[in-house]
């Protein structure tokens, strides 16, 4: 498993404001989008490109163009939606699928799938899974398996925060035949007894969109 944790003062600054409990939802949403754009630079480092002949105002040249079929960005609902704008700004030619998963509160490593809007065949597609929090790792593993069942073999996960327990679970439960990369802004200390990341930032979905009882 290829893990990349961003090391940049701008990321550290924005992440500190994001974590602050006094940061309002409007600012929180803007910061998530900005952080994802910074992550996308690393996440797309190995994106497939092809030669493209063009003419500049001065001379013809061979440039680069994102290869077909187009990459697909898959936000894990609902918190992953907050990351979608940043990713599509960086890869505007990408298609977007949606995957609704939530943690089983009685068994945190098990997931409940409640929505799916994805192509049936993902063979040959580069997939970018986006979900702000990698806590237990259960959602990420389940989502990766879900894409792999549809033929995906090249998956990059983009998360803002991770916990050591989640990283360990992902590494132990991923299908080794999948080319998998994980990009994070930071890895925090641990999970608490409610499986929240510590120090973390709270519930990302609630902070993005407000609490839903």
Curated annotation (Swiss-Prot):
The answer, when asked if Magnesium is one of the entry's keywords, is yes
Q: Which GO terms describe its molecular function?
A: GTP binding; magnesium ion binding; uracil phosphoribosyltransferase activity
User: Among the record's GO biological process terms, what is one?
Assistant: uracil salvage
Keywords of the record, alphabetical order, are:
Allosteric enzyme, Glycosyltransferase, GTP-binding, Magnesium, Nucleotide-binding, Transferase
**InterPro entries cross-referenced by the UniProt entry:** PRibTrfase_dom, PRTase-like, Upp_B, UPRTase/APRTase, Ura_phspho_trans
Q: Which cofactor is essential here? A: Mg(2+)
What's its EC?
2.4.2.9
Top-level lineage group: Bacteria
Q: Quote the catalytic activity from the record.
A: UMP + diphosphate = 5-phospho-alpha-D-ribose 1-diphosphate + uracil
Protein name as annotated = Uracil phosphoribosyltransferase
């Amino acid at each position: 498993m290829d893990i990349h944790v961003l090391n940049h003062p701008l990321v550290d600054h924005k992440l500190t404001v994001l974590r602050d409990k006094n940061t309002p939802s409007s600012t929180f949403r803007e910061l998530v989008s900005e952080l994802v754009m910074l992550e996308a630079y690393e996440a797309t480092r190995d994106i497939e490109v092809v030669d493209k002949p063009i003419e500049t105002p001065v001379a013809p040249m061979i440039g680069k163009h994102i290869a077909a079929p187009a990459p697909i960005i898959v936000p894990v609902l609902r918190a992953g939606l907050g990351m979608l704008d940043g990713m599509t700004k960086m890869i505007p030619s990408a298609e977007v699928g949606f995957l609704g998963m939530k943690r089983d509160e009685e068994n945190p490593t098990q997931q409940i799938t409640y929505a799916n809007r994805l192509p049936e065949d993902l063979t040959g597609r580069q997939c970018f899974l986006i979900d702000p929090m990698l806590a237990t790792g259960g959602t990420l593993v389940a989502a990766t398996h879900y894409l792999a069942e549809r033929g995906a073999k090249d998956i990059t996960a983009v998360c803002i925060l991770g916990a050591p327990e989640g990283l360990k679970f992902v590494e132990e439960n991923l299908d080794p035949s999948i080319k998998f990369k994980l990009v994070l802004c930071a890895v925090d200390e641990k999970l608490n007894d409610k499986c929240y990341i510590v120090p973390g930032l709270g519930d990302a979905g609630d902070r993005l969109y407000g609490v839903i009882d």
